[in-house]
Amino acid sequence: MIDERTIAQPKVTVYSTPTCPYCVMAKRYLAERGIKYDDVDVAADQSRALEMLTKTGQMGVPVLDIGGQVIIGFDRNAIDYALMNRK
């Protein structure tokens, strides 16, 4: 059986740093649900860090962009909501 959430999965980007424990938790949470994501290390890529700053107005991580819905911090409920109510 095909899971329609997989077919219609929104683009997911996780802005993170290697030393951030909440970033690790967020990425693990997505992986456990079979959600593919683009992992952006903002400590190593300043242009992507600026992109994150432009989207959020702040430099804290993790930041998740799920189909255009931005979530600051690791918030399971917000992640689930964004995945279920994708654009």
Where are these regions (language model features)?
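Glycine-/small-residue-rich active-site loops that bind phosphorylated ligands and cofactors
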Residues: 21, 44, 71
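Short alpha-helical
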Residues: 21, 47, 78
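Thiol-based oxidoreductase modules, predominantly thioredoxin-like and allied folds used
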Residues: 36-48, 58
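Major-groove DNA-recognition helix of helix-turn-helix-type DNA-binding domains
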Residues: 54-60
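Thiol-/selenol-based redox modules, centered on thioredoxin-like
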Residues: 79-87
